[in-house]
Amino acid sequence: MINSLLTRVFGSRNERQLRQLTRLVTQINALEPTIEKLSDAELQAKTPEFKQRLAAGESLDKILPEAFAVCREASRRVLGMRHYDVQLIGGMVLHLGKIAEMRTGEGKTLVATLPVYLNALQGEGVHVVTVNDYLARRDAAQMGKLYNWLGLSVGVVYPGMPHSDKREAYGSDITYGTNNEFGFDYLRDNMALSRADRYQRTLHYAIVDEVDSILIDEARTPLIISGPADESPELYIRVNRIVPQLTKQESEEGEGDFWVDEKGKQVHLSEAGMGHAEELLLQAGILENAEDGLYAAQNLSVVHHLNAALRAHAIYQRDVDYIVRDGEVVIVDEFTGRTLSGRRWSDGLHQAVEAKEGVPVQRENQTLASITFQNLFRMYKKLSGMTGTADTEAYEFQSIYGLEVVVIPTNRPTVRKDHPDQVFLNRKGKFNAVLADIEDCAKRGQPVLVGTTSIETSEMLSEHLRKAGVKHEVLNAKQHEREATIVANAGQPGAVTIATNMAGRGTDIVLGGSLESEYHALGEDATEDARFKIKTDWQRRHDAVKAAGGLHIIGTERHESRRIDNQLRGRAGRQGDPGSSRFYLSLEDNLMRIFASDWVQKAMRMMGMKEDDVIEDRLVSRQIEKAQRKVEAHNFDIRKNLLDFDDVNNDQRKVIYAQRDELLDAESVKDNVDGIRGDVIYDLVARFVPPNSVDEQWDVKGLEATLESELGVTLSLTDMVRTQEEIDAEQIAAKVQAAVDAHFAEKEAAVGNDTMRALEKHVMLTVLDQGWKEHLAKMDYLRQGIYLRGYAQKQPKQEYKKEAFELFSEMLENVKREVIHLLARVRIRSEEEVAELEEQERLHAQARLMASQFQHQDVGGYGTDEEAAQVQSGNAPVPVSQVTRDEPKVGRNDPCPCGSGKKYKHCHGQLS
């Protein structure tokens, strides 16, 4: 009550911030007459002037009014677009490192030019992050004209571009790209073996377009660079034949072999199902011993494959969760409806789906490097974002990213009519009403956009409309190549467009059709008469559509998130245009079936509702919104939990990447190697000759044998121990140290200082990377089983932190040992020996090629020749992309970032 009273008196925090920023807008507008009088050359000269002022110590905030005024005037001259006052406010919000919520059609792309120009003046690089490559290239091309005119360089990064071009793009003042590309480039940079192979500079400032999609929707999926593991995918094919023989039960207490937890997207075997599955696996020869049981330790791999196959069959649906294209299973993004080429599900799920669909099963992947978007974007010194729908997730933005959401008022009042939801008993009744609404709009010449949650639904509606003779377009992951054309025509009079969520973002639907597209089709050489005719025809269509009520939005199902529903609604009513929206629901929809209260369904059935009967009731709408809030809270918990675990990995990642940076920057790592060698020898001697021990406890022969086998050093210690009475463990350690040092000095003398320094650096980087890769695999296994600690009354997160620290310390010790072992045993060959070895390898390669081309296949027990061929020909996954940030250097006497409480030099700085 007090908060409500204070808000009425002083206004909400959002209103107070807008009032403060409006004062700056007044200053910018006051500068406009002066800026307008400047010639082009004088206006362009402002950029170097601003840079000089910043170098002299002036702040960005101080030059903001003038820089914004310059950018606005340059935009008017170059692009023919002048920023509105509300767009200036949006630009200031972005500069302040906050999220600007701006409705569809308010010109977010133009808004971003203001803070991008201002922050690019510092020369440290600005990243503009978009949701797909098309938008990145489009915006870089369109807005690049403005930035280039103002004297700033612009680059765009995309998958597969040449290394030199990508380095140049990252060296530009402004770089456009997708969140995936920036993230994968960061990971790639931290796998590079030389500075010259790296792309990025420091992570200075990022503006994230459609920030809710990237930082919320995609936060549950970490970016992973992976390589194929050694395990054969054949077991997925064999287990896949068994799953169709298992029976699904309707609930946990029902009869059958397994039940599905749709909320958690998991499948659970019943008691009977375990026995039945065990029997089938024994018959197929997958389980070897009936006495061991399915859950015996040696069968855990089979359980993993069985669970993956059950999820593939019972939960993941073709044309909903994925499509099959050119013999590959391609994931469909549940939030955007776009295909995610190059992305693969983890934990064997992708292989299980491939086996289910009968396409070549690729090998399971091993993680080489990974990071979540949460930890990636939190590394930027300053982060901001813009979207049309952020306010519903304001708490998450604030709690995880420290980003405040500021709602920017529209330039013109929104006049869109949002009609109440209509709820039907079943899907048939719902779709009858949807089809009737579409046909009515088409007859009246009102364009309609029909939003669906799956490809399957969009194609089903398309089939019904085709039979009814209604001309329409379908936009889903299968037709994504035609997206720009379909969206450009979606505002034509009477146009019917059926779309998955992918139509919800990026491109405005203009009433009457896209005038820009028609101008572009004419070409630059078109006469003024031709352009005038196009404009006249468009204006006539535009007015006709406005008279018919503007764009009408039909939602065929509520999404789990209110934000996605709001995005669909937001396609209509842009810039004060008329428009309308309505959602059609049924009790069979996933959201209603899984999350809505049972009493809603019971009440509707008790009322004797028939198939085509409809309910429009606020109480039902409130229940639907309550269900959505439940799902949003559930998904937030998942993302928060992911972050809690990844923060442990992130601390370790920072340590490893900081050490890699030190190694890459160092002229020589000889001091590092010498220090590590001392530690390794001390530990080695202590294994056989413990400190403060008597000679009866010593294993001198074991020490001699280990020195020979692990370090290639022949040293006789037995005689020394036998002949010297006063000898102790320290003297033995000193003798071993001297012998190993001499061995290394001899090796260096043979190959030369420069070669040895290069070899040391290469070995340290290679071994560190291999150790980190193996450590990531161990961390994955630890994480998968950590929840079982809860049964022992232990906190899984605390146990994860503790065991992850132990694994990390063990990994660093192993890296130190491996570096010294490799350097001690490496042999530098002469040029003649190298030539001979290369010739031998060439002959071996030819023999392997002949063997693979003419390999004879043994008769399989259960598989077909086709399935065997699929296993043999599985394509290795294409590695995906990365981003770099130089963290503040950790001093050797500073506390270690891993949280152990030790000094860095005594903990994870030991390699340094």
UniProtKB/Swiss-Prot annotation:
It is an enzyme of class 7 (translocase). CDD domains: DEXDc_SecA, SF2_C_secA. Residues 902-912 have a biased composition (Basic residues). It catalyses: ATP + H2O + cellular proteinSide 1 = ADP + phosphate + cellular proteinSide 2. Its cofactor is Zn(2+). It is a peripheral membrane protein. Its EC number is 7.4.2.8. SMART domains: SecA_DEAD, SecA_PP_bind. It is found in: Cell inner membrane; Cytoplasm. Keywords: ATP-binding, Cell inner membrane, Cell membrane, Cytoplasm, Membrane, Metal-binding, Nucleotide-binding, Protein transport, Translocase, Translocation, Transport, Zinc. Residues 865-912 are annotated as: Disordered. This is Protein translocase subunit SecA. The gene is secA.
